[in-house]
Amino acid sequence: MLLQRLSDRHDHASFRETHQWSIENPGDFWREAWNDLGIAGDPGSTAMTGQGFSYTRWFPEGSLNVVNTLLAGKPDDEVLVALTEDGPRRSFTREQLRGEVAACAAALEASGVRAGDRVAAWMPHVPETVIYALGALSMGAVVSTASIDFGPSALIDRFGQIEPTVLLVPARSTYAGKVADHASVLDEILLQLPSVTTLVVAGGGEARVSFEDWLAPHRGAPLAPVDLPFDHPGFILFSSGTTGKPKCIVHRAAGVLLKVLSEQGYHLDVRPSDRMLYATTCGWMMWNWLVMGLGRGATIVLVDGSPGFPDLGRLWSITAGESLSFLGVSAALIDTWRKAELDPKDFGTLESLRTIASTGSPLGPEGYDWVAESISPDIVVASIAGGTDLCGCLVLGVATEAVRRGEIGGPALGLDVTVVDSEGHQVSAGVEGELVCRTPFPSTPLEFWGDTNGARMRSAYFDRFEGIWAHGDFAKSTREGGFVILGRLDATLNAKGVRIGTAEIYRIVQSIPGIQDSLAVAQPHDGDSRIVLFVVTTDELDEALETRIRQELRSQASPRHVPSLIVRAPAVPRTRSGKMTELAVADIVAARAERDTSSLANPESLEWFRQWAKGSRDL
C-alpha cells in the first residue's frame, strides 16, 4: 500500500504523523509524491519556492507533459472501456488509445491549434471526449469540457468567455432512453461562438466534419507530447455561476495530475491494474479526476446516460460485469439505492469491489450502513470533498485507517486543512465552522480567465481570511481526525448532490414574460434536498406559466436546473444596494437559525417566507 510505504519510510506510527510531516515539509512531500506516483518528466532541482498562496511556485525548473504519465505502461493492457445506454461496449488498449490521441493531436495542429490555445468539447461521457482532451494536452492546448445536458444559454455563458478555436460536439446523445438530436442547435451555438473555426461532430452528421473523418488523415502519426513547464495551463473548469456568469478557473495540467494521483494513490489505494468507474458527466470535475486514473495504470470505465436506466441496478450490473475494484457515485445515489431497498448482489458477483467513493453532498451514517449491510462490511466507503476550485479533494478517505461511519477519513496529504470560526481562528473538534486550507498546493488555480489583476480570484478564496483558502463548506472536525461536511455557506444550490448556480436560473426565468423577480434555494427534504423556486409574477402563477418555466430551464440550462417546487411569492428580499439575499430565505426554508437582516431594504418580506416554510414540509 503506497500510503503505508510513505509512512514507513519516515518511521511514522500513524496517518496523523505522516500528514503533519507533509504540511511541515511540503517541498519534500510533493517531490516524494512525484517519484512515488511515477510522474514522467524532469522535476528539476527545486520542488517549491516562495511562501503563501500568492508567492509559492511549484517545480519552477520542472519540464513534463501529463500525457506521458497518463499513457505510460504495457501497450496491450485494456485501459479504457465505454458503455452507453443504447450502443455496444467499446474498449481500447493502451496502444490503441495512444494512436487515437496522436491522431487527434495532429488533427488539432492541422486545424491551427498551438500551445496555449483553447479548445472545447460539449460532449457525452464517451471515449471521443477523453481522446480529444488528451490530444489537446499532448500539444499544450488548454481544454475545457461541458456536459451535454447544458443548453445553448449555459454553454455560451461558459465557452463564450474563453473563445475556443475548435469545438467538439455530438450528433446525438441518449439519456434515460430518450435520444436527443443536437444538429438543430449547432448553428445557434456557432453564431454565438465566433472564435470557433473548426467544428467537429462525433457520431457523424451531414455537412459537418465527423470526428472519424477529422482524424483519418493523421492516423499513424507518432505520439510526441511536448514538454512544458509545470505552470503551463491545461484545463479550464467552470464555477457554478452563483453571482453571474460562471468563473473560468484555469488549472495547471501538471498540478491537477500530481494532486489527483496523490489522492488516488495514497488516500484511496488505487493500484495499477485496478478497474475504476466514477459516475459523472464531462461538466463535473470528477470527469477530470477519473481521467487522471489512467496515470495510476488503472482501467477507467466510462458510463454515459442515466445511472437509473433501464433500472436502478444499472451501475451494479456494470460493477459485476466489468469486475470493478473502485466505484464512485454521488451520495444522493447511494441514498436512492438505500431507500429503494436495492440489493446490489442481485446484479452479479461483486467480489472484486474494494472501494466505493462518494461525493457531491454529505453521505450520512445510513449510507455507510447500507453499503456494509447490502454488500460487505469489508468494503471501504471513502467519502471525499473538495471541488472544481482545486480539481481535487481537501478531505477524503485514509487508506491505512478503518472507515468511521458518517465522517470523512482525514485531510489530504500536503494540505493543512482545518475548521475555523468567523474570525479565522481554528475551532475545536466537534465545533461547526468553515472548512479552510492554510497551505498552498499544486492544484491551486493558476488564475481565473480574464481576471487580469487577480482580484476575482482573491475575492473568491482569500478575502475572508488573509492568506487562507476559504472553501465555503460548513463543516466540523472529529476527535479521530476526520471531518463532517454540513453543507455550503454560500448561495449555491446543492440538489441531490449536484451544484447549481442561482444566477443561471435567474437569467432564464426572468426573461420569461410575466416574471418580475425570482429567488431559488435548496430545501432539505426527505433525507435529501430539493430546489424551490420562488417567483414574483405580474398575474397568477397558472399551470401554463409553470410549464413554461420548467421547459425553459430544461432546454436552456439542464434538467438539473428544473426546480421541484415553483411557488408564487409577493416579493424577494433585497439589500439597500439592490442585492438579493438568498441566504436569508435559505435559512428560513431549511429551519436554520436566521442571520442578521439589518441590511435589508424590505425585511418585512421575510415574514411571508416564514409562513410558507411552516407548511412546506408536506408539499
Predicted regions and their residues:
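Conserved AMP-binding/adenylate-forming core of the ANL superfamily
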Residues: 17-21, 80-134, 151-156, 210-213, ...
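ANL superfamily adenylate-forming
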Residues: 86, 166-230, 340-341
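Conserved ATP/PPi-binding loop(s) of AMP-dependent carboxylate-activating enzymes
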Residues: 411-414, 425-462, 500
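Gly/Ser/Thr-rich phosphate-binding loop
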Residues: 296-298, 325-328, 338-403, 416
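Conserved AMP-binding/adenylation subdomain of ANL enzymes
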Residues: 257-275, 285-325, 340-341
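Conserved pre-ATP/AMP-binding loop-to-beta segment of ANL
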Residues: 76-78, 201, 206, 212-238, ...
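Conserved C-terminal "lid"/linker of ANL adenylate-forming enzymes
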Residues: 198, 519-524, 532-533, 550-619
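AMP-binding/adenylate-forming catalytic core of the ANL superfamily
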Residues: 121, 146, 150-172, 186, ...
